[in-house]
Amino acid sequence: MAEETAALSTEKTEDTSTAPSTSAEKADGIDIDTEAKRLMGAGQKHLVMKDVRSAVNLFQEASSLLAKQYGETADECAEAFYSYGMSLLELARLENGVLGNALEGMPEDDEEEAEKEEDPNIPSADNLDEKEREQLREQVYDAMAEDQRAPDDTSESEAKGKPEGDSKDKEADEKMKNGQKETEKVTDDLKIDSASRDVPMDKSGKGEPPESKDAETLVEQKESKPETLKEKSIETKEKDLSKEKTDAKETANQSPDSTEVAEEKMDSEASESKESTSIPPTENEANKPDDPEKMEEEEEGEDSEENEDGTEENEGTEEKETEEEDVGNLQLAWEMLDLCKTIFKRQQSKEAQLKAAQAHQKLGEVCIESENYSQAVEDFLACLNIQKEHLEEHDRLLAETHYHLGLAYQYSSKHEEAISHFTQSIGVIEKRMDVLTKQLEASVGELVDEVKKEMDELKDLLPDIKEKIEDSKEAQKNATVTEKALKETLVGGSSGFSKENGSTSSSSAVEKSGDSTVPVTNCVSDISHLVRKKRKTEEESPLKDKDAKKSKQEPVANGAGNGDAVVPTNEEAEKAEEASMETATVESTA
């Protein structure tokens, strides 16, 4: 018996041990649902308070929790997705607005004034009396006058107030002066060398004057001192000059002319050496690495420039990556609303279908914001069809969808459809007003206030819709006027060209009919009838010509012969002209 009781106790403990796991899972599920509901409620409050950004964050958290718990296409996620998409649409409207981001984060004037009043260290001019202000003005004027009278004092004060960097500049100036003094000494030595070329040569024949030794000793003494590289080069030049002097003086014994030439060369070289020694100190001092701090600063500046260029490039690449990764608010809103639309349409209940219609409406608004008016019209029509199935004729939602359809058609410049939908929205509102008036008569107490409030809201909507109708009518008139003007200009231009062509062709036809026997119906390009035949050659006998003339001159009565009309010729006129010319010649000879 004891064994059986022990076995039963173990089974009970096992059952009790397994039970808490299921209860914990239920508790976890309840916690997620409650947290999502809490987030949804807080988001709705923020939307009412027009704090859209915080509402977006809360709806995002709620939708992520529900999607992890139930899946992205679950029925439980539809409400959160709809709220999230709607809030994203509102946020996109704020960002696309003129003052969406301009005034965000800007301090208000009242806060700044309060801060100024709170600071006791900052004196305010408002608290001063007139006497104190006059005293301050006099002090300012006196200070300005003192500045004008004593500019030297200000210069001395500025000199005293200079930082340690000015002392370094003074040291550099002193170094420059010392370098100039050293160069002057070198030039004096060179003058001594040039003066020594007139001294006679030594007996040893080396050609070195006695004074040149003194110059060499001076140079050796200077070598013992710390000198720059350019001073050493000057010493080498001096040695070369001394050697050339000795060579020139050795040749002086052989030819006096050569000595003169050598002396001229020495003079020119000495003058060049003077110029070279007088200029380099400034360059030498400028190129000296005496200031390692400046060199380090330059290197640091170059390194900083390179680092800045690298950071700018990195920032540019990061911005591009973030732009590619980040999705716009409108795009994200469209995705969330489309997902919730599919979830609601899958359900067969009336509430779910009406929510699907609302999702269609919000999708149409997103398309209007993105200027995709054709897709917006399709979404609004789908919403309208669903609402007509499940709503009454006087429902405000129908008026809202008609209004949005009118806007979509108006933006797409389809004014007839826009006018029709605006008028339908007005008709729905009027029906709703009739229903509300009936409810006012029957209602009592708090219901009366609610009905009056709704009626006032509807009355406020009517003028806006009427203005939209007038705008669309004016736009339609302007469009028709412009179309007519364009047609008139196009048709008028073509008819003008045709009229001009017709008039010219008719006038040319008349002229042709008067000058020639060819009918008017000939083609314009055929000009063979305008070509006259050549006269007969003189080789023919004059008798034939006379016979031909006589036959042509014989008159023919109208209707005689074969019924052919006689064609007039120009030969008679030519004969008359010839006769007149002959008479004129006879008179002139007489």
UniProtKB/Swiss-Prot annotation:
PANTHER family hit by this protein: NUCLEAR AUTOANTIGENIC SPERM PROTEIN, NUCLEAR AUTOANTIGENIC SPERM PROTEIN NASP -RELATED
Primary role: This protein is involved in nucleosome assembly. It is bound to H3 and H4 in the absence of DNA, but released from H3 and H4 in the presence of DNA.
The keyword Repeat appears for this protein: yes
Biased composition (Polar residues): 496-525
Motif (Nuclear localization signal): 531-537
Main localisation: nucleus
Ranges for the TPR repeats: 36-69, 357-390, 399-432
Compartment(s): Nucleus
Presence of keyword Nucleus: yes
Species of provenance: Xenopus laevis (African clawed frog)
MF-aspect GO terms: histone binding; importin-alpha family protein binding
Biased composition (Basic and acidic residues): 128-250, 262-275, 536-553
Alphabetical UniProt keywords: Nucleus, Repeat, TPR repeat
Record's protein name: Histone-binding protein N1/N2
GO biological process: CENP-A containing chromatin assembly; DNA replication-dependent chromatin assembly
A GO term from the CC aspect: nucleoplasm
Similarity comment: family membership: Belongs to the NASP family.
Residue stretches of biased makeup (Acidic residues): 106-120, 293-327
